[in-house]
């Protein structure tokens, strides 16, 4: 099972639905749920930090990003939470995105396996990661956002600024499927 921490974003239920289409059990839980409570449930194999309007209302997710032993995928605000937790820089987007964005994958990796080097994704944010943390590598970028996706160099922690759960994102289901594989929920 994947738990989706609800940070109040408009697409949280789409994440749940997208996982259901992949036949992956998931559950939406409050973003205030303690990490110990999540990790004591042995059915939980991964965590998704959803998007949302306010990083200040997601402070518990900072602890989860830093201390979880489970794989994590941060989406939009969740991506920013991961960056902030590890010392990255969040700032106002140069161009507020509420539209399609062309994403460029730097090289194939666990998250972007079987995903083209260029694809169109749906973006919906005012803020973004403007400086990746030192212990993260940038996986993808766009012409208006230098850190569209990143990964911790040693832990299975990923962040994407765009929304793979939205149907407007090409290969979004494949990206979510790849995260599920990282969690050990799908075979190769």
From Swiss-Prot:
Keywords noted in UniProt: ATP-binding, Glutamine amidotransferase, GMP biosynthesis, Ligase, Nucleotide-binding, Purine biosynthesis
Catalytic activity reported: XMP + L-glutamine + ATP + H2O = GMP + L-glutamate + AMP + diphosphate + 2 H(+)
Record carries keyword Metal-binding: no
Keyword Repressor belongs to the record: no
Domain of life of the source: Archaea
All copies of domain Glutamine amidotransferase type-1, residue ranges: 1-188
E.C. code: 6.3.5.2
Pathway assigned in UniProt: Purine metabolism; GMP biosynthesis; GMP from XMP (L-Gln route): step 1/1
One annotated Gene Ontology cellular component of this protein: cytosol
Molecular-function GO terms, alphabetical: ATP binding; GMP synthase activity
Active site: 76 (nucleophile), 163, 165
Alphabetized InterPro entries for the sequence: Class_I_gatase-like (IPR029062), GATASE (IPR017926), GMP_synth_GATase (IPR004739), GMP_synthase_A (IPR023686)
PANTHER family documented for this protein: GMP SYNTHASE [GLUTAMINE-HYDROLYZING] (PTHR11922:SF2), GMP SYNTHASE-RELATED (PTHR11922)
Function noted in UniProt: Catalyzes the synthesis of GMP from XMP.
Subunit and partners: Heterodimer composed of a glutamine amidotransferase subunit (A) and a GMP-binding subunit (B).
Name of the protein in its database record: GMP synthase [glutamine-hydrolyzing] subunit A
